[in-house]
Each structure stands twice: as C-alpha cells, then as structure tokens.
Amino acid sequence: MSEMEVMASIMRDHILALLKEGKRVDGRSLEDYRDLEIKINVIEKAEGSAWVKLGNTQVLVGIKVDMGEPFPDLPEKGVITTNVELVPLASPSFEPGPPDERAIELARVVDRGIRESGAVELEKLVIVPGKLVRVVFIDVHVLDHDGNLLDASGIGAIAALMSAKMPKVVYDEESGEVQILDEYEPLPVSKMPIPVTIAKVGGNLLVDPNLDEELVMDGRITITTDENGMISSVQKSEGGSFKLEEVMYAIDLALTKAAEIREKVLEAVGAE
C-alpha cells in the first residue's frame, strides 16, 4: 500500500469515527452547508460575472454574450454553452491541457441545471429566426478546490447570469444589417436553479462535502431545483448506490438548502 493510500485509509477511519457521533472533520453537522460568499460584477469586461467562495472552494464565472447561428433543430431559440477550466494552481490534481472528465462533468451539470429549468428565456434571444440569435457563453474558472465544485459552479453561474446585461440590437429587414446599440438590457433570466450536492460516506449522507470527504466518499448525488420546487437536474457520480429512501431524503434536503442559497444569491444581486 502506497503512502497516499495509507493516508486516505487513516482519513476515512477518522471521518467515519466522527460521523458515528454526528460530527464532521470541519465541525459541521451532516446537514450544515459551509459559509457561502457571493460577489457579482467582478470582471469588468464581461457581460456578467460572479465570484463564489464556498468554504475554501473558490470559483469565478464570466458571462459573454455574442451573436451566431441557432441550432438547426432549435431555430427559434438562443444558444447557451458552458465551459469549465480547472486552473492548475487551484489543486495539485489539476493539470494543464484539454478538459478532463471532471471538467466535462462539471460543465454538463451546470449547463443541464440551467437549460432544463428554463432559467434563461431562450426565445427572447432570437434576432432573426433560424438565422441569427444571441449566444450566451458561461465560463467557469475554478480558483481553489476544497470540495463541492458542482454547487459552487452552479451557484456562480446563476448569479452571473442574473447580473448580466447585453447590448440592444436592431435588425433591418430590408438591408439585412444588424445594428448594435449603446443601450443595454438584462439577460432574460426567469428561474433560479440551485444545485445541492449530498455525499454518501459509510452509509451517512452529508451535504456540501469538502475535499477530505470527497476523497473517501462512496457516492455523490447533485440535485438542482428551482424556486418552485421543480427538479431540473439530477447527477449521480463517484460510484456507490442510493436507496429510494436516501434519494427522497436527499431531495428534501436539496430543496431546503437551495431555498437558503437562493436568498443569498438574491441578496448579492440586489446589492449591486
């Protein structure tokens, strides 16, 4: 057994011993979220942006709005695309190069939560049906990784979208020209999907796992819900299995925590 495996085994035993007492390595209860900080409009040249600090995990999300062609099967809807960069300085496990499986999963979970909830009214992003629409780029940069990147990134994405403003455009049907005005309007955001992640460690379910807990967890489920209690995304990863009663408990916990997080997002957006 390598030194790293020995350390992981020791950490797992320590975490499991604490969990038997209803405690966690950082002093939280099983249902406690870490401290959450949100700041918006932190990138001057972006249409929208947000910085999120969840415990010691930090992410920066930027929104860029451009123009382009719609998807062929969705000619009357704008486009959303999500990218994630795992900055090597954020964690020793991150390496430079093309996106790895973690970055791809992270981007998909964030994208799906926003897209399936209908958070952005894509119909309102159409300039010329079938030809020209707004393209919204969501770029997530992980600055410091101490666990639960899924929630931090999803929270940052919706906060950045809610802060975003895009230049108004006028389309001249006769000339076919598009004029970009100096006036700005908010991105049409009508829902607030919030992801909440619950990890399973030794039969215990705990919300918002930190990095130590993620390294020894048996499984993980991320549930994204909107303010109406509708589920827009569920992502199970890292192996393991969840019983039906565990999934139902996770949904209830996700709804409760999402409501609390939503208030903090609204507070951050309203403070600007």
Curated annotation (Swiss-Prot):
Keyword hit for Cytoplasm: yes
Keyword terms: Cytoplasm, Exosome
GO MF: mRNA 3'-UTR AU-rich region binding
Alphabetized InterPro entries for the sequence: ExoRNase_PH_dom1, ExoRNase_PH_dom2, ExoRNase_PH_dom2_sf, Exosome_comp_Rrp42_subfam, PNPase/RNase_PH_dom_sf, Ribosomal_Su5_D2-typ_SF, Rrp42_archaea
Classification via HAMAP family: Exosome_Rrp42 (MF_00622)
Gene (name only): rrp42
Family indicated by similarity: Belongs to the RNase PH family. Rrp42 subfamily.
Transmembrane feature ranges: none
Main subcellular localisation: cytoplasm
Domain of life assignment: Archaea
GO annotation (BP), single: rRNA catabolic process
Name of this chain's protein: Exosome complex component Rrp42
Described purpose of this protein according to its UniProt entry: Non-catalytic component of the exosome, which is a complex involved in RNA degradation. Contributes to the structuring of the Rrp41 active site.
Subcellular location: Cytoplasm
Description of how the protein assembles with itself and partners: Component of the archaeal exosome complex. Forms a hexameric ring-like arrangement composed of 3 Rrp41-Rrp42 heterodimers. The hexameric ring associates with a trimer of Rrp4 and/or Csl4 subunits.
Provenance organism: Thermococcus onnurineus (strain NA1)
GO CC field: cytoplasmic exosome (RNase complex)
Pfam families: RNase_PH, RNase_PH_C
